[in-house]
Protein backbone atom coordinates (compact mmCIF):
# COMPACT_ATOMS: atom_id res chain seq x y z
CA UNK A 1 0.00 0.00 0.00
CA UNK A 2 1.27 3.47 -0.87
CA UNK A 3 1.90 5.51 2.25
CA UNK A 4 1.65 9.25 2.76
CA UNK A 5 2.66 11.20 5.83
CA UNK A 6 -0.28 12.40 7.92
CA UNK A 7 -0.23 14.56 11.07
CA UNK A 8 -2.79 14.39 13.87
CA UNK A 9 -3.36 18.08 14.50
CA UNK A 10 -5.13 17.46 17.79
CA UNK A 11 -1.77 16.39 19.25
CA UNK A 12 0.65 18.36 17.05
CA UNK A 13 0.93 22.14 16.65
CA UNK A 14 -1.21 22.71 19.72
CA UNK A 15 0.54 26.03 20.32
CA UNK A 16 -1.22 27.32 17.19
CA UNK A 17 -4.83 28.23 16.57
CA UNK A 18 -6.81 25.42 14.95
CA UNK A 19 -6.94 26.88 11.46
CA UNK A 20 -3.20 27.64 11.45
CA UNK A 21 -2.26 24.01 12.03
CA UNK A 22 -2.99 22.96 8.46
CA UNK A 23 -0.35 25.24 6.99
CA UNK A 24 2.11 24.26 9.72
CA UNK A 25 1.68 20.59 8.85
CA UNK A 26 2.13 21.35 5.17
CA UNK A 27 5.28 23.36 5.90
CA UNK A 28 6.73 20.38 7.77
CA UNK A 29 6.24 18.08 4.80
CA UNK A 30 3.03 16.31 5.75
CA UNK A 31 0.69 15.41 2.92
CA UNK A 32 -2.46 15.05 5.02
CA UNK A 33 -3.89 15.75 8.46
CA UNK A 34 -6.38 14.02 10.72
CA UNK A 35 -8.17 14.97 13.91
CA UNK A 36 -10.50 13.48 16.50
CA UNK A 37 -13.94 15.03 16.99
CA UNK A 38 -15.56 16.73 14.01
CA UNK A 39 -18.47 17.98 16.15
CA UNK A 40 -16.38 20.68 17.82
CA UNK A 41 -14.97 22.06 14.57
CA UNK A 42 -16.27 24.58 12.07
CA UNK A 43 -16.32 22.27 9.07
CA UNK A 44 -16.52 24.98 6.43
CA UNK A 45 -13.56 26.84 7.92
CA UNK A 46 -11.68 23.56 8.34
CA UNK A 47 -12.07 22.64 4.70
CA UNK A 48 -11.10 26.14 3.61
CA UNK A 49 -7.94 26.06 5.75
CA UNK A 50 -6.93 22.68 4.32
CA UNK A 51 -7.53 23.80 0.75
CA UNK A 52 -5.61 27.03 1.31
CA UNK A 53 -2.66 25.07 2.71
CA UNK A 54 -2.83 22.51 -0.08
CA UNK A 55 -3.09 19.59 2.32
CA UNK A 56 -5.58 16.70 2.40
CA UNK A 57 -7.80 15.77 5.32
CA UNK A 58 -7.44 12.06 5.91
CA UNK A 59 -10.27 11.65 8.39
CA UNK A 60 -11.51 11.79 11.97
CA UNK A 61 -13.38 9.69 14.53
CA UNK A 62 -16.79 8.57 13.41
CA UNK A 63 -18.48 6.87 16.35
CA UNK A 64 -18.49 9.18 19.41
CA UNK A 65 -20.94 8.02 22.10
CA UNK A 66 -21.88 4.60 20.71
CA UNK A 67 -20.30 1.14 20.85
CA UNK A 68 -20.08 -1.67 18.33
CA UNK A 69 -20.13 -4.24 21.14
CA UNK A 70 -23.49 -3.12 22.53
CA UNK A 71 -26.30 -4.80 20.56
CA UNK A 72 -28.74 -2.11 21.72
CA UNK A 73 -26.59 0.57 20.10
CA UNK A 74 -26.69 -0.77 16.54
CA UNK A 75 -29.17 1.69 15.03
CA UNK A 76 -27.87 4.64 17.03
CA UNK A 77 -24.34 3.75 15.95
CA UNK A 78 -25.36 3.66 12.29
CA UNK A 79 -27.31 6.90 12.56
CA UNK A 80 -24.33 8.70 14.04
CA UNK A 81 -21.97 7.14 11.49
CA UNK A 82 -24.16 8.59 8.74
CA UNK A 83 -23.67 12.04 10.27
CA UNK A 84 -19.92 11.46 10.45
CA UNK A 85 -19.80 10.40 6.81
CA UNK A 86 -21.69 13.55 5.83
CA UNK A 87 -19.17 15.60 7.80
CA UNK A 88 -16.30 13.76 6.11
CA UNK A 89 -17.70 14.58 2.70
CA UNK A 90 -18.13 18.20 3.70
CA UNK A 91 -14.42 18.58 4.45
CA UNK A 92 -13.28 16.28 1.65
CA UNK A 93 -12.05 13.48 3.93
CA UNK A 94 -11.72 9.98 2.52
CA UNK A 95 -12.25 8.03 5.74
CA UNK A 96 -13.54 7.90 9.29
CA UNK A 97 -12.08 5.98 12.21
CA UNK A 98 -14.24 3.66 14.29
CA UNK A 99 -13.76 1.73 17.55
CA UNK A 100 -15.31 -1.17 19.41
CA UNK A 101 -16.25 0.98 22.42
CA UNK A 102 -17.33 4.57 22.93
CA UNK A 103 -14.51 6.78 24.18
CA UNK A 104 -14.96 9.72 26.53
CA UNK A 105 -12.68 12.56 27.56
CA UNK A 106 -9.03 11.61 27.42
CA UNK A 107 -9.84 8.42 25.54
CA UNK A 108 -11.39 6.79 28.61
CA UNK A 109 -13.60 3.83 27.67
CA UNK A 110 -17.11 4.89 28.64
CA UNK A 111 -18.48 1.41 29.35
CA UNK A 112 -16.52 -1.83 29.74
CA UNK A 113 -19.74 -3.85 29.33
CA UNK A 114 -18.76 -6.29 32.05
CA UNK A 115 -22.38 -7.46 32.00
CA UNK A 116 -21.97 -8.79 28.45
CA UNK A 117 -20.13 -11.98 27.56
CA UNK A 118 -17.23 -12.07 25.11
CA UNK A 119 -19.49 -13.88 22.64
CA UNK A 120 -22.21 -11.23 22.78
CA UNK A 121 -19.68 -8.43 22.31
CA UNK A 122 -18.01 -10.16 19.38
CA UNK A 123 -21.27 -11.03 17.63
CA UNK A 124 -22.63 -7.52 18.16
CA UNK A 125 -19.47 -5.96 16.76
CA UNK A 126 -19.54 -8.22 13.72
CA UNK A 127 -23.23 -7.63 13.07
CA UNK A 128 -22.96 -3.84 13.31
CA UNK A 129 -19.77 -3.79 11.23
CA UNK A 130 -21.59 -5.66 8.47
CA UNK A 131 -24.13 -2.85 8.34
CA UNK A 132 -21.36 -0.23 8.57
CA UNK A 133 -19.58 -1.83 5.63
CA UNK A 134 -22.75 -1.74 3.53
CA UNK A 135 -23.15 1.94 4.38
CA UNK A 136 -19.51 2.64 3.52
CA UNK A 137 -19.91 0.98 0.12
CA UNK A 138 -23.03 2.99 -0.59
CA UNK A 139 -21.45 6.29 0.47
CA UNK A 140 -18.03 5.51 -1.05
CA UNK A 141 -16.18 6.26 2.18
CA UNK A 142 -13.49 4.23 3.94
CA UNK A 143 -13.85 2.97 7.51
CA UNK A 144 -10.74 2.29 9.59
CA UNK A 145 -11.35 0.07 12.63
CA UNK A 146 -8.80 0.75 15.38
CA UNK A 147 -7.66 -1.63 18.12
CA UNK A 148 -6.41 0.11 21.28
CA UNK A 149 -4.11 -0.78 24.15
CA UNK A 150 -5.97 -1.90 27.24
CA UNK A 151 -3.34 -1.46 29.95
CA UNK A 152 -2.19 2.15 29.68
CA UNK A 153 -4.70 4.35 27.86
CA UNK A 154 -7.96 2.52 27.15
CA UNK A 155 -8.71 0.01 29.90
CA UNK A 156 -11.84 -1.97 29.08
CA UNK A 157 -11.73 -1.57 25.30
CA UNK A 158 -12.89 -4.78 23.63
CA UNK A 159 -10.89 -4.76 20.39
CA UNK A 160 -7.32 -5.10 21.62
CA UNK A 161 -5.50 -7.33 19.10
CA UNK A 162 -4.62 -7.06 15.46
CA UNK A 163 -5.60 -10.67 14.86
CA UNK A 164 -9.20 -10.19 15.98
CA UNK A 165 -9.60 -7.01 13.95
CA UNK A 166 -7.96 -8.46 10.85
CA UNK A 167 -10.01 -11.65 10.94
CA UNK A 168 -13.24 -9.66 11.22
CA UNK A 169 -12.19 -7.43 8.32
CA UNK A 170 -11.35 -10.48 6.22
CA UNK A 171 -14.62 -12.23 7.08
CA UNK A 172 -16.70 -9.20 6.14
CA UNK A 173 -14.69 -8.85 2.95
CA UNK A 174 -15.58 -5.25 2.15
CA UNK A 175 -12.81 -3.18 0.53
CA UNK A 176 -14.18 -0.11 2.31
CA UNK A 177 -13.55 -1.63 5.77
CA UNK A 178 -9.93 -1.84 6.91
CA UNK A 179 -7.89 -1.79 10.10
CA UNK A 180 -6.21 1.24 11.57
CA UNK A 181 -2.98 -0.28 12.84
CA UNK A 182 -1.50 1.76 15.69
CA UNK A 183 2.11 0.74 16.32
CA UNK A 184 2.15 2.32 19.78
CA UNK A 185 -1.02 0.58 20.97
CA UNK A 186 -0.04 -2.79 19.55
CA UNK A 187 3.51 -2.68 20.92
CA UNK A 188 1.93 -2.42 24.36
CA UNK A 189 -0.71 -5.10 23.77
CA UNK A 190 1.09 -7.70 21.70
CA UNK A 191 4.57 -6.70 20.46
CA UNK A 192 5.96 -8.56 17.42
CA UNK A 193 5.32 -5.52 15.21
CA UNK A 194 7.13 -6.79 12.11
CA UNK A 195 5.51 -10.25 12.24
CA UNK A 196 2.12 -8.61 12.68
CA UNK A 197 2.66 -6.42 9.62
CA UNK A 198 3.67 -9.50 7.61
CA UNK A 199 0.64 -11.50 8.73
CA UNK A 200 -2.06 -8.84 8.61
CA UNK A 201 -0.73 -5.89 6.61
CA UNK A 202 -3.15 -6.64 3.79
CA UNK A 203 -5.99 -5.55 6.08
CA UNK A 204 -4.47 -2.17 7.00
CA UNK A 205 -6.04 1.01 5.69
CA UNK A 206 -4.23 3.50 7.93
CA UNK A 207 -1.27 3.40 10.33
CA UNK A 208 -0.54 5.46 13.44
CA UNK A 209 2.97 5.82 14.82
CA UNK A 210 4.27 6.88 18.23
CA UNK A 211 6.91 5.35 20.44
CA UNK A 212 6.40 3.28 23.55
CA UNK A 213 6.49 3.88 26.40
CA UNK A 214 5.27 7.45 26.58
CA UNK A 215 3.51 7.90 23.23
CA UNK A 216 6.11 10.37 22.02
CA UNK A 217 7.93 10.74 18.69
CA UNK A 218 9.47 7.65 17.02
CA UNK A 219 13.00 7.24 18.32
CA UNK A 220 12.21 8.23 21.90
CA UNK A 221 11.24 4.77 23.12
CA UNK A 222 11.86 1.07 22.64
CA UNK A 223 10.37 0.49 19.18
CA UNK A 224 12.91 -0.06 16.38
CA UNK A 225 11.16 2.17 13.86
CA UNK A 226 13.96 1.88 11.29
CA UNK A 227 13.25 -1.83 11.06
CA UNK A 228 9.48 -1.36 11.19
CA UNK A 229 9.55 1.10 8.30
CA UNK A 230 11.83 -1.13 6.20
CA UNK A 231 9.50 -4.03 6.89
Give the positions of each predicted feature:
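A short, conserved beta-to-alpha structural element at the edge of catalytic cores
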Residues: 203-217
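Aromatic- and acid-rich polysaccharide-binding/catalytic face
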Residues: 175-186, 204-208
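N-terminal pre-domain/capping segments
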Residues: 1-94, 119-120, 170, 174-178, ...
